């Protein structure tokens, strides 16, 4: 596992990585979300030993099917650290905050190749595959809090 620290940061700290991984070739502003500046939004950065941001995730309240829920969006890891546990640290940290805030349901729209990754943390695909931004295949994935 790559040695990383995870910290709560302002969106400006993670936007360059989010843009490079999730919106390659587009202006950085294309990677901004409406929810980025909400007071309840949580931005997490994973830092390597040199202080470089190598992973990021954004979490915020967003109801699903009429239920209060915690949503994960903008999950990204630098290509050179994929498979090293950086993503795991980010998901575990974000889920822990959701639990602290009382959310029993967490959800995300996961890119199809990442479905297996999210399954490891208790997320389950719901419904059919769909095309999201820039026609990239995704699945809605939900996770009920473990009791």
Summary of predicted features, one role per range:
Residues 1-15:
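A short beta-loop-alpha structural element at the N-terminal edge
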Residues 81, 85-93:
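Conserved acetyl-CoA pyrophosphate-binding loop and the N-cap/start of the following alpha-helix
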């Amino acid at each position: 596992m790559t040695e990383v620290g995870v910290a709560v940061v302002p969106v400006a700290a993670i936007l360059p990585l989010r843009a490079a991984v999730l919106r390659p070739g587009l202006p950085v502003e294309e990677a901004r979300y409406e929810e980025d500046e909400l007071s309840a939004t949580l931005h997490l950065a994973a830092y390597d030993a040199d202080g470089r941001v190598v992973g990021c995730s954004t979490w915020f309240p967003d109801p699903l099917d009429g239920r209060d829920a915690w949503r994960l969006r903008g999950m990204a890891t630098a290509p050179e650290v994929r498979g090293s546990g950086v993503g795991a640290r980010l998901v575990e940290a974000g889920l822990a905050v959701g639990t602290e805030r009382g959310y029993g349901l967490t959800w995300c729209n996961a890119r199809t190749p990442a479905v297996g990754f999210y399954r490891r943390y208790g997320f389950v695909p719901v419904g059919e595959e769909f095309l999201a931004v820039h026609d990239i295949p995704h699945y809605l994935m939900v996770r009920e809090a473990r009791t």
